[in-house]
Amino acid sequence: MKIFVGNVDGADTTPEELAALFAPYGTVMSCAVMKQFAFVHMRENAGALRAIEALHGHELRPGRALVVEMSRPRPLNTWKIFVGNVSAACTSQELRSLFERRGRVIECDVVKDYAFVHMEKEADAKAAIAQLNGKEVKGKRINVELSTKGQKKGPGLAVQSGDKTKKPGAGDTAFPGTGGFSATFDYQQAFGNSTGGFDGQARQPTPPFFGRDRSPLRRSPPRASYVAPLTAQPATYRAQPSVSLGAAYRAQPSASLGVGYRTQPMTAQAASYRAQPSVSLGAPYRGQLASPSSQSAAASSLGPYGGAQPSASALSSYGGQAAAASSLNSYGAQGSSLASYGNQPSSYGAQAASSYGVRAAASSYNTQGAASSLGSYGAQAASYGAQSAASSLAYGAQAASYNAQPSASYNAQSAPYAAQQAASYSSQPAAYVAQPATAAAYASQPAAYAAQATTPMAGSYGAQPVVQTQLNSYGAQASMGLSGSYGAQSAAAATGSYGAAAAYGAQPSATLAAPHRTQSSASLAASYAAQQHPQAAASYRGQPGNAYDGAGQPSAAYLSMSQGAVANANSTPPPYERTRLSPPRASYDDPYKKAVAMSKRYGSDRRLAELSDYRRLSESQLSFRRSPTKSSLDYRRLPDAHSDYARYSGSYNDYLRAAQMHSGYQRRM
């Protein structure tokens, strides 16, 4: 017969001692001492009953009365009570005796500063919670409430594995007051934040990707540039759609971009420019004005070239755009509404007085007086965009288009290009004439001005007959009489001419530092001479940002600088300067192929400690190179073309063994 002996201190009670206690009442078969109780098996039932009668309440140790009773099978369901804020001085036996006054305690376990007490009956558990919650035990007020698990299942009612995924809040059939999920530990009730005694609240379901969502890519705050207040962003960007910049440039508020960017007038010249049948200008430029009617007529009637441009502003380039418009990439990169010559919001007309014509009476192309007799580009009667048809058939006022100009258009100008005064093209200081002949003339540019059909237009842009000595056009004027003319001037005399510049549109941003006529240096190396090859610009639209509208800085700033300084100012500085600690360039005599080295450099995913310079101190000289790599993004510097490790290894050889390896060893930074 199995006898339960409770209130036993298992630390100082041995099974032999307990067996000797029960031996006088019968044969003791076995004795097992647990932490706080013991089991004694006796052969005879009568002896067991006598032992229970005699030993119940016996003090085996002073102050510890034994609880001796017939052993009963563990109840299938016990009520689990959570006891929080338990003092470290409180033992499990003391806590058990505290709860046993309210009912039978099946189990009592103290875990650090909290405990779990299992009681047999629900009524006893509720009574114990009501009476003991907030009671001070050993100097601490204990927090007593029903555990979130609520009811402990016996072995016959073991929780099925599928119940672990049971919906929160489904409820427990045996104890409806608690939530249906079974959490190992309730944070709310453990820290005393529970609101009710038995209304165990189901914890909210975990967000689906909580464990994954700690990625810095998704959790970090957005970049400051994206969340800048609307007022901090330039109105240029504020009004633009994300894909096309064209329509936005036309709709930009005039407050941010100045007068020059206000919507252009819709004039006959604008329509004629867009509708030109020219081979080169027709296709790319005709389709670039999405909605010409949207241009307001409030701007001046200067036409496409000079639409509402500030007359005497020191605009730095072709585009003549204000400094605030530096965001406009280039002639060609601008959106569809800005790409064409005729549709530029501010162009030839906005150049300062020191432009091509250098006319005191006219500050720029567009603002030249109609009485001016100079036939040069800058001194035409009115301007490209706004000249009347009766004037010297200038750019904007030609009969139908570039191709359809009458042959007398340029010839009829009162003074040919070559006959201009000392300020003409050929005699300008550091003017087009001084430029080298590297760039092709206008006529040879693909899809540029010079690509216009040559036959129907004697006075057309690109292919005017060379016979006419009156500077028939920009592109193909006779080379001998007009060394400073725009187009087909001889390479020696007019290499810097309009045509030799590889088209305005094809110039990179760093080349057109100064206005065409007002460059102060005697050498134009930093100007037209440094322009890209004409094939680099198939048309205006394909250009990278050039100085005409990308720089947007007033020409006065450029005029005060030398050409070299301007080129340095416009060129991008190198990303970093090589020092002794810079990573070596990949050598050509590397036994490992350069592609392999590059793939290792780009494909490796090493931690910062492995990237640092002290990897060179490793015992194995090539261990880092031969180590396997992982594939992930690499944000280190690009591989260099040459190795300069050997150049720096001389001072290291005395005390750094790793520096003696061959020069192709890749030091990773």
From Swiss-Prot:
Modified residues (Phosphoserine): 161, 220, 242, 244, 256, 272, 280, 520, 523, 527, 562, 582, 618, 620, 623, 627, 643, 649
Domain of life: Eukaryota
Subcellular location: Nucleus; Nucleus, Nucleolus; Cytoplasm
The entry's keywords: Acetylation, Cytoplasm, Immunity, Innate immunity, Isopeptide bond, Nucleus, Phosphoprotein, Repeat, RNA-binding, Transcription, Transcription regulation, Ubl conjugation
CDD domains, A to Z: RRM1_CoAA (cd12608), RRM2_CoAA (cd12609)
One Pfam family cited in the UniProt record for this chain: RRM_1
Region (TRBP-interacting domain): 307-354
Ranges where the record places region Disordered: 147-175, 193-232, 284-303, 566-592
Gene Ontology BP terms: centriole assembly; innate immune response
RRM domain sequence ranges: 1-73, 79-149
Record cross-link Glycyl lysine isopeptide (Lys-Gly) (interchain with G-Cter in SUMO2), residues: K126, K135, K138, K149, K153, K164, K600
Full protein name: RNA-binding protein 14
Organism: Pongo abelii
